[in-house]
Amino acid sequence: MGHRFLRGLLTLLLPPPPLYTRHRMLGPESVPPPKRSRSKLMAPPRIGTHNGTFHCDEALACALLRLLPEYRDAEIVRTRDPEKLASCDIVVDVGGEYDPRRHRYDHHQRSFTETMSSLSPGKPWQTKLSSAGLIYLHFGHKLLAQLLGTSEEDSMVGTLYDKMYENFVEEVDAVDNGISQWAEGEPRYALTTTLSARVARLNPTWNHPDQDTEAGFKRAMDLVQEEFLQRLDFYQHSWLPARALVEEALAQRFQVDPSGEIVELAKGACPWKEHLYHLESGLSPPVAIFFVIYTDQAGQWRIQCVPKEPHSFQSRLPLPEPWRGLRDEALDQVSGIPGCIFVHASGFIGGHRTREGALSMARATLAQRSYLPQIS
């Protein structure tokens, strides 16, 4: 009885264990999150951001945080009131301070010039971070490991962390900070369907000011979260596995053609360009790949020119100008290769009914390279 009495007394006197454990922040430095009072432990965490017109960066920052288990049920507090912001567990895109130790992630203050490169030495990206980039920098590895069902030490997490920043988050950082894609000159056409543009259109219009901004912000978070998860799924299940196919194609390139400048992909629909550029630099002997051949969904063969850069529309060596825009028999006659299907008007891709025919188109182009007008 005495022991039971003492255990009961200790249970009453000692504080209860916390209802949940907050994670340690990831990024350039690991710091403990601010401690919450016992009363706050009973309530969901609070994510603070500014009210009024919203933008893609804070919508993405809040959405990424809510994908983490510890913030899944977090309340979004949209305000500029310093007292209300002070009561929040984490604040993004407002408040005028960047202090990871206190979980304050604003980028608008004059003193803020941080980039992924400056905060994570070794990373190449030098675009000024927005609140989206800051949250991704500090929580991204943990988030991806959680979503991918693996550990942060898994090399896949590091690969996809870089891929998602370069091809998703950095764009949001740049747009929010007003950084143009072009160093000089005017763009030839408008980009109006970007993620940032679609988020902006969820704000109330000038002639309907009574629209619910809070509902619009929730739709914005849902939009950016869905796109983030879709992109991650594509990179995990399509882009990353394609690397092995490109590696195999490069290893077999001399069996395809003695020049080593033509590769054949086992599955043509795979995303090969970035992998080829990365792997090509390590080839021995060094060689530039000019053409990729593969079968399409109809079982016919395609010959695709390797672009000068992964996202470029300009080819290293386009198909001959006299072939461009022609089809079928007209193309057969001009090329001297029976069985042709088409050559695109820009010369970046063509089709043939057989593998040997596609190879003949590539070899004929290589043979004429010194006489071809190349796109500069």
From Swiss-Prot:
A GO CC annotation given for this chain:
mitochondrion
A single GO BP term for this record reads: rRNA processing
Select a single GO molecular function from the record's annotations and give it: 3'-5'-RNA exonuclease activity
The catalytic activity of this protein is classed by the Enzyme Commission as: 3.1.-.-
- Transferase as a keyword of this entry, yes or no, is no
Signal sequence interval, chain numbering:
none
Q: In which tissues is it expressed?
A: Ubiquitously expressed, with highest levels in testis.
What positions does the transit peptide occupy in this chain?
A: 1-47
> What are the entry keywords?
Acetylation, Hydrolase, Mitochondrion, Nuclease, Nucleus, Phosphoprotein, Transit peptide
Report the transmembrane regions from the record.
Answer: none
Q: Primary place of residence?
A: nucleus
Subcellular location as annotated: Nucleus, Nucleoplasm; Mitochondrion matrix; Nucleus, Nucleolus
The broad enzyme category this protein falls into is hydrolase
| Phosphoserine modifications at | 120
**Residues modified as N6-acetyllysine:** 267, 273
What disease is mentioned for this protein?
A: Several works have found that mRNA expression is elevated in the skin of vitiligo patients.
PANTHER family in the cross-refs:
METAL DEPENDENT HYDROLASE - RELATED, MYG1 EXONUCLEASE
The similarity comment for this entry is: Belongs to the MYG1 family.
Report what the protein is called. MYG1 exonuclease
Organism of derivation: Homo sapiens (Human)
Species lineage, top-down? Eukaryota, Metazoa, Chordata, Craniata, Vertebrata
Q: Point out the gene that encodes the protein.
A: MYG1
